[in-house]
Amino acid sequence: MSGFSLESEFYCCKCGTKGIPIARKKGKAREAGHLKKLYCLKCGKETNHAECKEFTHYSKADFDFEREYGNFDENQNRILDYGLFRDKMHNKGVDLP
C-alpha cells in the first residue's frame, strides 16, 4: 500500500485554533507533537502549529495541557521537550492528561 496516508490535525500554538488537517504518506509521517509553520486563519499570520494524532503519545489533550501551562514561548516554540515538561509538571503535582 504505497499510497496509504495518515491524516494529522494541527493546532495553532499561539491561539489554540484548529488548523487545516494534512494527510501525509505513511513513510513521510512526522512524530506526533511535531511543530510546523502554517498560516493561522484566526491570527492572520504564519505561526507554529502542533501536530496532534489521537491514540498516540501526543493528542489534542496533550497540546491543550502544554499550552495551558505555558510550554510555548512568544514565537510558539517549545521551551522544554514535551517529555521533560510533563515530568516537571508531574513533580509540581499538576494532574497530567
Where do the language-model regions lie?
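Short, low-complexity N-terminal segments with a bias toward positive charge
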Residues: 9, 20-22
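Cys/His-rich microdomains that often coordinate metals
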Residues: 19, 47
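Secretory-pathway extracellular proteins and peptide precursors enriched for disulfide-bonded cysteines
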Residues: 4, 32, 40-41
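Short, charge-rich amphipathic interface segments used for partner binding and complex assembly
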Residues: 42-45, 51
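Short linker/helix segments within small regulatory modules
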Residues: 25-37
